[in-house]
Regions:
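The feature marks the mature, well-folded catalytic cores of soluble enzymes
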Residues: 1-162
Length: 162
């Protein structure tokens, strides 16, 4: 397999101009195994949280395009809460952390876009996470970026580049 490095791809600084911000809409998954085990999450007001999520997306959309990944079961509610400037992208998701399950985007010397699809394992604890493990590939395909698959388990957002 060809590596991003061999094709002169690099991860641009976080502040570097980019095409859009990817977010994931909070999906209330009744099959989620461990949220009630986390005391600070056990009393989470899901609907209030969704409205706050929408406020964040709207604020970001004042400066750049926002693409919101939304579980098919949540499309109707997302359309009623999200501002019409937010692009809704329909795909199953288990959680709302695009920072962790999403792609790591790259550029090469010709400013061609690439993306790494890491293995996402639900932080080693939460399940199911199989839908979230497909989010990065979806993002890369939707962005028409060159696809790089990694077998490394990694939260893509844990890498910071300045």
């Amino acid at each position: 397999m060809t590596s991003p490095q061999s094709l002169n791809y690099y991860m641009p600084a976080e502040w570097y101009q980019h095409e859009c911000c990817w977010m994931q809409w909070p999906h209330e998954n009744p099959n989620r195994n461990s949220y009630l085990e986390v005391e600070s999450w056990s009393h989470f007001d899901f609907e209030k949280g969704r409205h706050k999520w929408a406020e964040v997306a709207k604020a970001i959309s004042n400066f750049e395009k926002v693409k919101m990944i939304v579980h098919p079961m949540d499309i109707k509610i997302a359309k009623t809460i999200l501002h019409n400037s937010i692009e809704i992208c329909k795909i199953k998701n288990d959680d709302c952390w695009a920072r962790d399950s999403g792609a790591t985007f790259l550029l090469n010397d010709q400013r061609k876009l690439g993306g790494i699809d890491w293995e996402f394992n639900g932080w080693g604890k939460f399940s199911p996470h199989d839908s979230d493990n497909k989010i990065a590939k979806f993002m890369i395909e939707q962005s028409s970026a060159e696809y790089f698959k990694s077998s490394m388990v990694l939260e893509g957002g844990s890498i910071h580049v300045d």
